[in-house]
Amino acid sequence: MASSSLLLASVVVAAMVSAVSCGPPKVPPGPNITASYGDKWLEARATWYGAAKGAGRKDNSGACGYKDVDKAPFLGMNSCGNDPIFKDGKGCGSCFEIKCSKPKACSDKPVLIHVTDMNDEPIAAYHFDLFGLAFGAMAKDGKDEELLKYVAGDGDVVEVEIKEKGSEEWKALKESWGAIWRIDTPKPLKGPFSVRVTTEGGEKIIAEDAIPDGWKADSVYKSNVQAK
């Protein structure tokens, strides 16, 4: 019975989004959420799309360029974010804690979600359009009034650099779109490469030899480092 109730309420939420998707913006987006905002809770709105317990398509490149978002580290707990959350791609991979604002109707327990795509539905200053799995983990009855909290930790990336083995020079990459970064160079670069990421708060995170010699395109290499 609880599962049926959740599914029904989720469909109602999705219908509300459809009703406001046409015409000029109804609610302007709020200011960008930054690392300096702190741990205050903000009022937001959450909607749901896809299968009731969906974790996203296997090849869900979206606006961030991620794939296999149903697998680690995302595990389907993902969301599209509007402008102040997506931030022209710089919000890709950011983590948020979200919870329902009505304790009697919801678990009132924060759940962790990742930003993997964008949305432009003008329904709230802060709008999360969640995968079904993430939505169900948060709300028992699908209430669309939510509170959100920026997770402690500075995760928005503003610069990515790489360094060849044996070199002291860090070479800056250019942001192509979303979470996709590239480097244009007249000569081949030789791995392994160390990667240095600068966050919005100024933290520099270095992953030594994160990309091996003989690397291949469309491959994943784990760094085992993260923002504090």
Swiss-Prot record:
Gene3D superfamilies according to UniProt = Expansin, cellulose-binding-like domain (2.60.40.760), RlpA-like domain (2.40.40.10)
Which cysteines does the record link by disulfide bonds? 64-92, 100-106
**Cellular location(s):** Secreted, Cell wall; Membrane
One GO biological process from the UniProt record? Answer: sexual reproduction
- A Pfam family per the record: Expansin_C
Signal peptide stretch:
1-22
Sugar-bearing residues? Answer: 32
What protein family does this chain belong to?
A: Belongs to the expansin family. Expansin B subfamily.
Its function, per the record, reads: May cause loosening and extension of plant cell walls by disrupting non-covalent bonding between cellulose microfibrils and matrix glucans. No enzymatic activity has been found. May be required for rapid internodal elongation in deepwater rice during submergence.
Q: What is this protein called?
A: Expansin-B13
What organism does the UniProt record list as the source? Oryza sativa subsp. japonica (Rice)
